[in-house]
């Protein structure tokens, strides 16, 4: 899955810290489910027959169930699937515990002795609108008619909302699913259709083939007005895309990418795909980005369906990455599954890393590992906070696992796997993964099982100890490099040492922060750092395992690169001599090395370890760097400075942006050229966005307004790679007419990508009155899956952030009712943009924001919001420094 799937706040309540697990006196073997959705009434009913093995003499059978009506329970000895003769049924009473989300089936007399039994019952429920469990997804078709799809999202613990079950990941079973498909509708599930019979009132009863043994959170069924593409045979696997009618022309990229992924993973893992079909299902309403249900992967439409002629390169890259991520889960997560929710990070981190490997094989020219550096930077940003957490931490209750669906799980987890792979070598790492999957297929594991398998291929490298230091404690180090003996006749020596990196020197008074065992900071003290140390220009790197004590390594003359290749998850601080050498050799560094040098410099500025003059010196060496990701660090830094600077100093930031960026836009031009590098469109878009907004380049903003007007009038179509940038600039300068035009395009989009692009641009508005209109739509018209992200974007925009914050204060209860529970905390990721201070250095908004959130946010989501509060404090402290440092940006221009 690409984002969270359960309410992070659900853990609050009377049960407190009690471990919430099912008794282990019985295990399921097989579920036979009949599911009958009624799309018109918004309800469903069903029948469950669960073959289970009772291991102990039991007074009750305890399963999970939530928001279900359960009737007619009975228990019979024997399993029909094993050919057992059915025994006499025993009647059962039902005791529901809503707080524990359990249903106890209690014999009316006696106990249940060990043996094989079949538990049967009927059940019913409501197709909810919360995008979890068995829920409704609604869209309006081309004739203006509202259409309803019934679909599922069960991770982490919402299968219990659809049918009674043993809803824990290690209680795997076979699922034999039958669905009553209304007339004119299509039903899909995890397995291929096996047979169907006509229903008396119209429609079909469709039975699907039994699945492999799998966890309940991977079960899926989707019913509605849908179409499926003809199946493509991929080495015996039937591949389809399922979509709403009229969108079949948008599936080619998905089919091509999935075809490649199935073959790539089969070869990489050395195991066949664990099934015979794979449906990729595009849904209008979906809280997560996508979900790895075995054989029936569900997606947001904009992350699956794309028109290549109207899709930017970066957008196509994202679509392929999500597809590759979910298909990787078919092996790593579905075939082999974590034992308990504390291990969900490994499923997601490994799928994130493998998606990069797969996509890099699919389109090497995209340089996806360089693209990933931007996402890794987000993880480093959170991990430099005292409110960070270990990647893996104890989970007593399933709902606590929801706090793991963040950049630390996905991006930090993937980054440390990549760091390990680069240190060991790809072949050794892959053989370890193959060993792990082969040994644990169809079973459940802990992370140490993977470390042991990789360690068996790693020689003397202490894999388990290295990974434990990165996974079981929060934070990351600043690796300091000091060059010794550079002026002597012998080879120079590089002295390496480490210390914890943090944006604030000490933890702030953060009422939302959790204190772990008396520790005020979630950042660890030292790590086993697998370093690759090389020279500028690609010298073969040395392997150095840096512990708590400093290490010295001989290096060749020239500029040393501590994070050679750029795969390490840490910051690097160079002494003045080493930094000067790297800047002199900047053009021969690899793209990731250049990215890291700029990003690490900016991070040390944010942390108060360096002044803006140091950043300006590094940025002046970018020259004509061709990589858009390197430039994105500079653009992001200047954008934040514009957000936080005193109003009187904002022209200085704008001038620095124009001096640095305008020569690059002149170099790449506005229009695609024959022979353009794959990176040029992304660079052009980033430059136009920055210059047309905080860069205050009037000619750029005027050109964007003209391009938008021509497209609205039907005179031209903006190039797909530039469309998002043009919209961002137009929204930044928008009046009522421009807002109306953007909303009209949002309501009648060309394709799902166009819808998202128009909606996202609204976060750039600067007129508070226009912002209020859009905020009102977030509670009515804008899909609940998208609204939290838009509000966060609006919070982070200087001119409308205060207006947006007042809206959040006034409407938070409504937002909590309407938005998916797993994404409400996303709203508050925008509050660091409220870090402005007055002339005396007093925060304009931060104190009231912190006070409100302390009283308004409850449960496990406080941990996530606490991180945003700490980022806000870091921005406040940066804002206090700016009057004294912004002049150091004066005259900034690239050296050539």
Please provide the spans of the model-predicted regions.
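A surface-exposed beta-strand-loop module
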Residues: 67-141, 201-202, 549-557
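N-terminal, polar/Ser/Thr-rich
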Residues: 1-45, 79-80, 144-149, 169, ...
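Glycine/proline-rich low-complexity spacer/linker segments in large multi-domain proteins
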Residues: 13-23, 112-113, 120-176, 224-229, ...
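Hydrophobic helix-coil surface modules that form long, contiguous segments used
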Residues: 46, 152-157, 164-324, 353, ...
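Beta-strand-rich interaction surfaces with strong enrichment in secreted/lumenal proteins
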Residues: 34-36, 92-94, 106-111, 162-166, ...
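Surface-exposed beta-strand/loop patches in extracellular or lumenal glycoproteins
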Residues: 49-68, 176-182, 497, 501-532
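Long, ordered, helix-rich scaffold segments
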Residues: 376-378, 495, 534-544, 549-896
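Hydrophobic alpha-helical and helix-loop surface patches within well-folded domains
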Residues: 1, 10, 149, 208, ...
């Amino acid at each position: 899955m690409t984002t969270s799937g359960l309410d992070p706040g659900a853990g609050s309540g009377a049960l407190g810290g009690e471990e919430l697990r099912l008794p282990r006196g019985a295990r399921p073997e097989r579920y036979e489910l009949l599911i009958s959705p009624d799309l018109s009434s918004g309800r469903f009913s069903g029948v469950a027959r669960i073959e289970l093995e009772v291991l102990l003499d039991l007074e009750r059978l305890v399963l999970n169930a939530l928001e279900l009506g359960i009737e007619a329970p009975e228990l019979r000895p024997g399993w029909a699937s094993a050919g057992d003769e059915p025994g006499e049924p025993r009647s059962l009473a039902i005791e529901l515990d809503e707080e524990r989300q359990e249903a106890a089936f209690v014999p009316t007399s006696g106990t249940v002795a060990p043996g094989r039994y079949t538990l049967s019952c009927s059940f019913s429920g409501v197709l909810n609108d919360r995008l979890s469990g068995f829920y409704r997804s609604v869209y309006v078709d081309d004739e203006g008619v509202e259409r309803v799809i019934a679909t599922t999202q069960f991770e982490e613990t919402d299968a219990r909302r659809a049918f009674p079950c043993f809803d824990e990941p290690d209680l795997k079973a076979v699922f034999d699913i039958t669905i009553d498909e209304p007339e004119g509708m299509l039903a899909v599930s995890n397995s291929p259709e096996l047979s169907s019979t006509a229903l008396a009132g119209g429609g079909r009863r469709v039975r699907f083939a039994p699945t492999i043994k799998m966890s309940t959170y991977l079960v899926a069924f989707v019913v509605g007005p849908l179409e499926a593409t003809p199946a493509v045979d991929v080495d015996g696997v039937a591949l389809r895309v399922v979509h709403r009618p009229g969108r079949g022309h948008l599936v080619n990229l998905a089919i091509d990418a999935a075809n490649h992924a199935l073959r790539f993973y089969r070869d990489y893992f050395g195991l066949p795909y664990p099934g015979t079909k794979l449906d990729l299902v595009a849904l209008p309403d979906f809280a997560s980005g996508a979900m790895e249900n075995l054989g029936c992967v569900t997606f947001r439409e904009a992350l699956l369906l794309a028109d290549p002629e109207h899709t930017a390169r970066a957008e196509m890259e994202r679509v392929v990455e999500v597809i590759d991520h979910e298909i990787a889960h078919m092996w790593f997560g579905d075939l082999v599954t974590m034992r308990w929710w504390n291990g969900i990070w490994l499923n997601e981190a490994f799928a994130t890393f493998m998606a990069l490997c797969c996509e890099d094989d699919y389109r090497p020219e995209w340089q996806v590992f360089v693209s990933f550096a931007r996402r890794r930077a987000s993880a480093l940003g959170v991990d430099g906070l005292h409110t960070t957490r270990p990647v893996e931490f104890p989970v007593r209750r399933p709902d606590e696992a929801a706090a793991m669906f963040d950049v630390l799980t996905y991006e930090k987890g993937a980054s440390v796997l990549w760091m390990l792979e680069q240190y060991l070598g790809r072949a050794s790492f892959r053989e370890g993964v193959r060993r792990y999957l082969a040994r644990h297929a169809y079973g459940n594991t802990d992370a140490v099982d993977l470390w042991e398998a990789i360690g068996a291929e790693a020689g003397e490298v202490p894999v388990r100890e290295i990974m434990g230091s990165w996974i079981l404690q929060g934070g990351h180090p600043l690796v300091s490099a000091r060059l010794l003996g550079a002026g002597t006749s012998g080879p120079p020596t590089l002295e390496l040492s480490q210390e914890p990196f943090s944006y604030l020197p000490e933890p702030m008074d953060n009422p939302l922060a959790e204190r772990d065992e008396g520790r005020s900071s979630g950042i660890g003290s030292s790590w086993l750092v697998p370093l690759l140390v090389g020279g500028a220009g690609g010298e073969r790197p040395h392997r150095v395992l840096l512990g708590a004590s400093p290490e010295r390594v001989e290096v060749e003359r020239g500029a040393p690169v501590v994070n050679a290749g750029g795969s390490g998850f840490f910051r690097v601080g160079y002494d003045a001599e080493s930094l000067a050498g790297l800047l002199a050799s900047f053009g021969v560094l690899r793209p990731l090395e250049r990215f890291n040098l700029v990003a690490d410099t900016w991070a040390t500025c944010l942390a108060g370890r360096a002044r803006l003059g140091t950043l300006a010196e590094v940025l002046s060496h970018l020259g004509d760097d061709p990589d858009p990701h390197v430039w994105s660090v500079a653009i992001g830094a200047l954008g934040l400075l514009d957000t936080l600077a005193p109003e009187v100093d904002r022209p200085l930031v704008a001038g620095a942006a124009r001096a640095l960026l305008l020569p690059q836009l002149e170099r790449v031009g506005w229009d695609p050229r024959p022979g353009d590098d794959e990176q040029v469109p992304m660079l052009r878009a980033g430059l136009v966005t920055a210059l047309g907004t905080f860069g205050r380049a009037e000619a750029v903003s005027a050109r964007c307004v003209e391009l938008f007007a021509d497209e609205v009038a039907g005179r031209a179509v903006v190039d797909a790679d530039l469309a998002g940038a043009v919209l961002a600039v137009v929204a930044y300068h928008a009046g009522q007419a421009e807002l109306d035009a953007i909303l009209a395009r949002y309501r009648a989009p060309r394709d799902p990508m166009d819808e998202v692009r128009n909606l996202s641009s609204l976060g750039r508005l600067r007129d508070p009155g226009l912002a209020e209109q859009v905020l009102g739509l977030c509670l009515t018209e804008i899909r609940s899956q998208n609204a939290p992200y838009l509000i966060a974007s609006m919070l982070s925009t200087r001119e409308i952030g205060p207006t947006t914050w007042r809206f959040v204060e006034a409407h938070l209860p409504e937002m909590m009712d309407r938005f998916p529970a797993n994404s409400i905390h996303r709203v508050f990721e925008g509050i660091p943009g409220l870090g402005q201070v007055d002339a005396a250095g007093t925060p304009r908004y931060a104190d009231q924001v912190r006070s409100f959130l302390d009283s308004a946010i409850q449960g496990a989501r406080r941990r996530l919001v606490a991180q945003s509060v700490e980022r806000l404090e870091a921005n406040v402290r940066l804002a206090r420094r700016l009057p004294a440092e912004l002049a150091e940006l004066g005259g900034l221009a690239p050296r050539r």
